Amino acid sequence: MVLKNKTRNQTIMKNKFVVDWALLLSFILSAFSGIKLHMLGHGMGHGACRFWGTFHIGASLVLLLLVIIHVKMHWNWYKHLFQKGLGNKSRTTAVLSLIFLLLASTGIILLEGECRRSAIGIWHFYLGIAMIILAVMHIFKRWARLISAL
């Protein structure tokens, strides 16, 4: 029985690390393509904008799916956050979660056809910048664990 639990725990940890590395890659692709799209809005051609827009949507949808899986894997953290408050829990993680929720919401609104230069589009851009900063902080705090998993 102990061996079975050990194997199960190893599988869970391996899955968490696979999801974490996939999250990192999809985050980088989404952030890079979002910044590229913003730069394209300042004068580059329509074809390039269409390519990067499609790329950004794809990378961001993969990111959204992975974040949902990641949150599910760490659901106890969120459950305790709602039950007992922030306490000594990571404020960066809590704010990052909120920013991501807002960023994903504005992204979905933009997907529905809202103009990216609208107020929602501008909010999406600034939330994206905040997300990049907070995600980098979140990643650096966990970097040693990510590397040790390789």
Language-model segment annotations:
Residues V2-L150:
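Membrane-embedded alpha-helical bundles that constitute the cytochrome b-like, heme-associated redox core
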